[in-house]
Amino acid sequence: LKRELEPAALSGRVILLPLVNPEGFYHGSKQTIPADGQNLNRMFPGKSDGTFSSQLARVLEETLYPEADFLMDLHGGDVNEALTPLIFFPTAVPEKLATQSALAAAALSVPYRVASTSKNGLYSWAAQCGIPALLVERGERGLWSKEEVTACKHNVYEMMEHLGML
């Protein structure tokens, strides 16, 4: 995706974080960070004096959130998960923010959408901080097929279109 995007052709900026938990990814456990066994997506809001996962969550909050007008979190199923493609979007937020996130979710060609009241993940805490956001889940057993990668990239382009970036 990074090689495909032409910054001059975009209205706005795309920030890509291709792998936030590389240690877990390469050890076959994307859900947890091996350093402390915690699920990063349950550590928000982070703490600068907390576990490694909590500190990483805090760094993401401090560096990514201030730069984001919208946050799209892309996940793949871990080794113990078989997922049907779906989107989680926040609803435990002010109505305007919930509507922005729901409309963004509706703009993506993903078959299922889940209205979520979660508050402790990257996307859901971003929404608590005033940033419209959603989470796309796709893949299973720790793997993504070529078709799933293509579909995920297509979703990113759909989101950029929805946001008026293309």
Which residues does each PLM region occupy?
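Structured catalytic-domain cores with a bias toward divalent-metal coordination
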Residues: 1-166
